[in-house]
Amino acid sequence: MPKTAPSPLSESAGEVFAQLAWLVRATRPQLAAACALSKPTVSVAMSELEAAGLVERDGTAHGLTGRSAAVYRLAREAGYVLAVDRGSTQVSFRTIALDGSLLDEDQTSQPDRAWSMIGGALERRTGDGPLRTAVVAVSDVVLPDQAADPTTAERVAQAVTSLRLPQAVPVAVENNVNCAAIAELHDGGDEHRDTFVYLQVGVGIGAGIVIGRRLLRGRNGAAGEVARLAYPWTDGREPGREALEARLGSPGLMRLVGSVWRNGDGPLPQDPEEVFALAGRGHERAGALVAEHAGEVGKLAASLVSVLDPGLVILGGGVGRNPLLTDGVRRTLAALSWPTKVEVSRLGERATVLGAAHLARDHGVNAVVTGA
């Protein structure tokens, strides 16, 4: 029977455990330096962690003076966490150890059967200690006060319930675009990016806002819900609720395509991928539509930049990642707002589940430290 920590760790043991989780492997002197603790204090902390079955020795390191020191890592019995991207058309998951090691991942295009995929994955983890926590990413606002919007709260609850996660496991829920922004912060390829906007353009639109390496959620959990921006903002026309998303989301793009496509343009494209593919091959009508769409997305980016001045906008989503969109967004942004770098996400469709995994790992380590 694996040993766990049924009660909170001492303050020093908690610090050492958290540092070892991020360092993956370390000696006691390295942990003492990382935690700014004395070597005797670290030794006592390590004894506590070893007794709890949370850490184990993993070889020996030899210094320049010839002295050797035991290397430690988290024990398998420390447990693992689960991250789920609960989309409307697909569900993906990752299970990771508390040191960040990937244990398993998979996806399905049958959301109503995702519980079976995830249940099987958890059964395969019986030798990896307890499941400490789960984070589920959803395509809705996650409300601090569910009474503020019971309809949205119920939709989120149903999405989580459909996964049939173990009842004893703490579950945190986060917006999918926010998760993608967290992934860009940690895995996007530039360790110096600490303030940026992740702008997702796909079936819907949304923004994840990171300021000083911290995700901005807002009072209602709705920071970045750009679908609610007033649109259109022009004389003689009243803005509609989420009208901007109706214009810039994939369904809106395809409605526009259908309204202007002519017989001489060839077969009507059935999805944005076809429109962009035709534009890439020099199709005049498709090229004009893509240019117009890029300009509209650029206006949205300019609105965000005018308020936040992030210095960097990262484009994501099925449409947002298309390179044909990027130049138009850059041109529009340059014409309307402050100097801002525009990049395309390199994480692709995995961004949301990667970000959820980072959150789950944070929660999991904290659960061990606090004895939750």
Enumerate the predicted regions with their spans.
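Phosphate-binding/catalytic loop of phosphoryl-transfer enzymes
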Residues: V84, L98, V135-A243, R361-A372
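ATP-binding/phosphotransfer module of carbohydrate and carboxylate kinases, centering on a glycine-rich
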Residues: M1-T60, L64-S109, R113-P130, L165, ...
